[in-house]
Amino acid sequence: MDMSYLKDMPIAILGAGGVGKTMAGDCALAGKEVRLWDSPRFAKMNFVNIEKTGITLSGNQFSYFGFQRRGTAKVALATDDMAKAVKGAGIIIVAAVAIAHEDIFRQLIPLLEDGQVIHILPDNCGTFICRKLMREMGCTKKVIVGAWYTAPYGIRIVRRGGVVTNECKVEDRITTIRGCALPDCDTDDFMASAYYIPAFGAIIDAEGEVTISKKGEEFHHGFVRGNTVLDINLSNVNPVIHVPGAVLGAAVMQNFDTVLGKNKADYSLY
């Protein structure tokens, strides 16, 4: 399918945490119309002054081939009304933690329109939940639902004086990402739609590049087609990195403000 119809359509981003807010700013800086949604529970905190300040992308932004996008841009809409966010959008990006997926999809599914493409990142089995709920809720809209194994950046939202700001400190941008759709027959169209997401800029910029490791192995940059959605979820390194780090660092967490005399607010797994 020719996915070029997505070129001039708005992008809706569901979830205004670190990944969602950064992707919103990134896409807006590239000139896209972006609608950013967050649940009423978090919107008051995550949208403080966003209409006045816009979203700023800062940080080192390390990327192997040097791609960066810096500056401040305003989104077209920041709202806790999902219907307003997704109406007429071509691409819907779900950038939320796994425990929020079911609630988000239960709200989203009745609002879906034919031709929309849903990108879930990181997927954390969200594609399975979405398709399962679509069947249960009797949704017959012709949409594409696909998974990415991770987010396109390593980022932190800057906090000042306990206030969540609209500055996104991007430390690095990845140059390769694995993706797949559910069902797999939609994967080619899903991968093609990714070129209309400016937040994947470093990946698009690196498309076709090949680097050689010290062991002589070839590493291909750009978008990589996964075998299945299950493959995508098993490709996520976070469980391998974060679980051992949390378990082995439990004593440090417990004693950060006592034995170590540090401020608990400054604790980081890293």
Predicted regions and their residues:
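Rossmann-like NAD(P)-binding element
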Residues: 66-121
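Active-site-lining helix/loop region of Rossmann-like oxidoreductase modules
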Residues: 169-270
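Rossmann-like NAD(P)(H) cofactor-binding subdomain of soluble oxidoreductases
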Residues: 98-164
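NAD(P)+-binding Rossmann beta1-loop-alpha1 motif at the extreme N-terminus of oxidoreductases
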Residues: 2-64
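Short beta-strand/turn micro-motifs composed of small residues
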Residues: 15, 38, 96, 122, ...
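Solvent-exposed alpha-helices and their adjacent loops that cap or buttress functional pockets
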Residues: 3-6, 70, 85, 169-172
